[in-house]
Amino acid sequence: MPNFSYSDLLPLGADATKYRLVSTEGVSVVKHGDKEFLQVEPAALVKLTHEAIHDINHYLRAEHLQQLTNIVKDPEASPNDRFVAIDLLKNANIAAGGVLPMCQDTGTALVMGKKGQYVLTTGKDEVAISQGIYDAYTKLNLRYSQMAPVTTWEEKNTGNNLPAQIEIYADSDHQDEYNFMSVSYTHLTLPTIYSM
């Protein structure tokens, strides 16, 4: 019989990614007794989610772009490898303009959060995250991909890419952090929202 071994779902390793600060508005540190808590207002979650949906549809990480460049320069890469890498770089350049997304099918929004025990939020986080997704899909040039049943045989596009799949887990290892991973079809980003 194998020994029991626990592993976090999508555990974080060392991270050298350069992040940008979206905003400090709606985020504060509050004291209760001798403990400090990170307080995140719903508006901050809405803004962060909107920015995450925008960014995963328009930008590739610098490391990913470098890997594509390395393929183009690799003498052992096949002509097909180079063709695909060059086309992906061209597409990334167009998408970085912020108008056209990298992929026409912008996919179902999947959000996984790990919320530390010293992070306080008011209201339902899922509602604020859904509002950010709604704002992104109704204000940006993103294609709606969600279909909802009308009858047993009929479907209708929701027109806002909701409902999203949102999962928020308690995270005692990172007590004062709220980490999100947003996935949309083929794009991935792992921003740390806030930490004290």
Predicted feature descriptions by range:
Residues 1-85, 95:
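Acidic/polar, glycine-rich intrinsically disordered N-terminal extensions of enzymes
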Residues 175-184:
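Short coil-to-beta-strand
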